[in-house]
């Protein structure tokens, strides 16, 4: 067997040349777009989710099989896509916080506003929670037959259910709206009469409506009470005849009054009223005269002082004093040695003389 040549042995024993080593591939950043979209590749594949619980049991086995097939198809789609819908919640998205004061109404305004305007309540953390009474009223509004036309008006909300008027959680604006609507209804009921000629029964139930009716009827009755009295003007001959009759008789009988009215061309009522006024005037005159007499009598009761004005032998005393002879002193003719007080002015001031 011939030995192989040096060329053949050299080529057979020499190792094959190796290619130059390639540089390592650059490591992808965990914040790359593909990683953010596809999620983490090292996570195990998601487990198939159990079928959702239904509130009502399926009507047949075919419905149950269809629900299971739908759940399996959903799990397969999620596995093929490489990420589950539940992983979306694990992604860290940047959070933007916007101050609520710039885009929201003030809290006190929203709290006071009626439910049909803003059906949410403000929480201390700034969240918005649906108001229970607003949701109930919205359902009542949608179910009411008038919801198609008056959907934007507050009247269906306030008049949909009378039981909701007793809720304590109502805002002041809703209460004011209800009161105004009821008052308008009352006024309309008072103004519009019924088919039988009577007003609406609701207006007569409250005492306020009775007061309103009394006030409405009073202007019609007041003109009747405020009739202008006609003043009768008597002629001189009529006044003279009436005065002469009054001097003879203060009160007339019906027959006398009728005869006097016929003679003077007056009515019996005019004659009767004239005699009433004349009697009142006569009574006033009597009272004035009596008062004047009482005043004069009271003035006469005043005490009058009467001094001593005359002595009997005043002339003889004067002559004796001139001659210088003593004259026997005698008492004066007046019975009172001192001034006397008389109680009546009729008494004359002449001194009372004593007979000798």
From Swiss-Prot:
- One GO CC term on file: nucleus
Tissue-specific expression: Expressed in the developing CNS, including a specific expression in vestibular structures throughout inner ear development.
**Which parts of the sequence are annotated with region: Disordered?**
1-57, 129-229
Q: Which domain of life is it from?
A: Eukaryota
Q: Please give the residue positions where the record annotates the modification Phosphoserine.
A: 153, 180
Name the residue ranges with Low complexity bias: 191-208
User: Which sections of the sequence are annotated for DNA binding?
Assistant: 227-286
Name the UniProt key words of this record, in alphabetical order: Developmental protein, Differentiation, DNA-binding, Homeobox, Neurogenesis, Nucleus, Phosphoprotein, Transcription, Transcription regulation
Instruction: List the SUPFAM superfamilies.
Output: Homeodomain-like (SSF46689)
Q: InterPro entries, per this entry?
A: HD, HD_metazoa, HMX_Homeobox_TF, Homeobox_CS, Homeodomain-like_sf
Subcellular location(s): the record lists:
Nucleus
Q: What is this protein called?
A: Homeobox protein HMX3
Print the organism lineage.
Eukaryota, Metazoa, Chordata, Craniata, Vertebrata
Q: Which gene encodes it?
A: Hmx3
């Amino acid at each position: 067997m011939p030995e192989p040549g040096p060329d053949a042995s050299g080529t057979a024993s020499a190792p094959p040349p190796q290619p130059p080593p390639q540089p390592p591939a650059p490591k992808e950043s965990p914040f790359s777009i593909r990683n953010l979209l596809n999620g983490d590749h090292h996570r195990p594949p998601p487990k198939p989710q159990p079928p959702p619980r239904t509130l009502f049991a399926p009507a047949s086995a075919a419905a149950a099989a269809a629900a299971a097939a739908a759940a399996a198809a959903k799990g397969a789609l999620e596995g093929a896509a490489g990420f589950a819908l539940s992983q979306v919640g694990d992604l860290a998205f940047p959070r933007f916080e916007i101050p609520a004061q710039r885009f929201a109404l003030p809290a006190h305004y929203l709290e006071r506003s009626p439910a049909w305007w803003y059906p949410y309540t403000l929480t201390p953390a700034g969240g918005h929670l649906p108001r229970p009474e607003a949701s109930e009223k919205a359902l009542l509004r949608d179910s009411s037959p008038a919801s198609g036309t008056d959907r934007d008006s507050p009247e269906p909300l306030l008049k949909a259910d009378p039981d909701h008027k007793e809720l304590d959680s109502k805002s002041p604006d809703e209460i004011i709206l209800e009161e105004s609507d009821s008052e308008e209804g009352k006024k309309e009921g008072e103004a519009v009469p019924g088919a039988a000629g009577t007003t609406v029964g609701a207006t007569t139930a409250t005492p306020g409506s009775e007061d309103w009716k009394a006030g409405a009827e009073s202007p019609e009755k007041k003109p009747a009470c405020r009739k202008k009295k006609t003043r009768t003007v008597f002629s001189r001959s009529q006044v003279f005849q009436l005065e002469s009759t009054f001097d003879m008789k203060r009160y007339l009988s019906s027959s006398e009054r009728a005869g006097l009215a016929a003679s003077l061309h007056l009515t019996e009522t005019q004659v009767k009223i004239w005699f009433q006024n004349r009697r009142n005037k006569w009574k006033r005159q009597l009272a004035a005269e009596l008062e004047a007499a009482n005043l004069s009598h009271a003035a006469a009761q005043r005490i009058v002082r009467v001094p001593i004005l005359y002595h009997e032998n005043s002339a003889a005393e004067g002559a004796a004093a001139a001659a210088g002879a003593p004259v026997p002193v005698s008492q004066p003719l007046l019975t009172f040695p001192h001034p006397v007080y008389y109680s009546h002015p009729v008494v004359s001031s002449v001194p009372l003389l004593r007979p000798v």
